Regions:
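Flavin-dependent oxidoreductase catalytic cores
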Residues: 1-318, 322-338
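Conserved acidic E/D residue at the C-terminus of a beta-strand in Rossmann-like folds
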Residues: 340-344
Length: 344
């Protein structure tokens, strides 16, 4: 959700988000809103203003140097995070996640890679974590102690002078001290962006050991993430107790029916994410929205009508290439009896 100093604009998001939460709840699901401030991981070309950060240090992958935040501005931002969470609750979200990973503002404060301050928001680990802790406490104050707040952290930033697993474990404990209810264990910053959303050359579930280390540091649940795109691998992570939950984002884009198929014993029918990054990251980066190379319906659901046909027909599809197979699948989903013929 948007963190903004224009209250009217922010309040205007509540109704549109409520439409989403109501549909999720009607299907029996739970939904959390991720709230964040990009900090220095953006540019004036996007926002129209100079980026802000804990220190006036340029992010290596970004074109401009950010402006250092003043103490009063930091206090205002803490309040705005809390206000954003309050709007999320009003919109029907069951929880919020504070994005303190990937070099975004809360994470930038926590990391010595981006925070060079010498006041109460810099220097020691506790000082660097203070911004995130104050955000969590502000949210709890405005939304209630029983309203779940997750905190996302980059366990390892993979940049010189960035967070390592030992410092991140301390930060996770401090967020727990501030009343965070769960730690979402991610990795990387924009300067090491290939680690944030690992491509196919990275091992599956390659960062689970980071989550396992986090579990040793805190008493609250820990979420593992990072190319967990296979049901069996996800289950093995949970059975090993290296994490309490797993994130399967791209896997769910490849097949939104993944949970239902698994629950019905149809795991072998799951459309598997191949970690190609072409449809999800590639197309979204071009401003075309989310797509998926292995599922042509992803992001295009409103443009295709797969409701059952009034009268089932015999359909012959000649050619078993990608297009032919997809045509056969679509026809079958509409209730037709399909024969697929391939020359070879």
């Amino acid at each position: 959700m948007l963190i903004t100093n224009t209250k009217q604009k922010a309040d205007g998001q509540i109704e549109s988000h409520r439409k989403l939460t109501e549909r999720v709840h009607a299907a029996g699901g739970k939904i959390a809103a991720q709230i964040y401030h990009a900090g220095r991981e953006t540019s004036s070309a996007v926002t129209g203003v100079q980026p802000v950060a804990p220190s006036a240090v340029r992010e290596p992958s970004m074109p401009e140097t950010p402006r250092e935040l003043t103490i009063p501005e930091i206090h205002t931002l803490v309040e705005q995070f809390g206000d954003c969470a309050k709007r999320a609750k009003a919109a029907g979200f069951d929880a919020v996640e504070v994005h303190g990973a990937h070099g975004y503002l809360a994470g930038a404060f926590a990391s010595p890679f981006s925070n060079k301050r010498s006041d109460e928001y810099g220097g020691t680990i506790r000082n660097r974590a203070r911004f995130g802790m104050e955000i969590i406490r502000n949210i709890k104050e405005k939304c209630g102690e029983d309203y779940p707040v997750l905190y996302r952290i980059s366990s390892v930033e993979y940049v010189p002078g960035g967070l390592d697993i030992e410092e991140s474990k301390v930060i996770a404990r401090l967020m727990e001290e501030a009343s965070a209810d769960c730690i979402h264990c991610s990795q990387g910053v924009y300067a090491s962006t290939h680690t944030i959303i690992p491509p196919s050359v990275f091992p599956r579930a390659g960062y689970v050991e980071h989550a396992a280390e986090m579990k040793k540091a805190v008493q609250i649940p820990v979420i593992a993430v990072g190319r967990i795109n296979d049901v069996e691998i996800a289950e093995s992570v949970l059975q090993s107790k290296k994490a309490d939950l797993v994130t399967m984002a791209r896997a769910s884009l490849a097949d939104p029916e993944l949970p239902n198929k698994v629950l019905k014993g149809r795991g072998d029918e799951v459309i598997r994410c191949i970690s190609c990054l072409q449809g999800c990251i590639g197309e979204n980066g071009k401003g075309n929205g989310i797509r998926c190379l292995v599922n042509p319906l992803t992001g295009m659901e409103d443009e295709y009508d797969l409701t059952p046909a009034e009268k089932a027909k015999q359909v012959l599809v000649i050619g078993g290439g990608i297009a032919g197979c997809e045509a056969a699948i679509s026809a079958a989903l509409k209730g037709h009896k399909v024969t697929l013929i391939e020359k070879k």
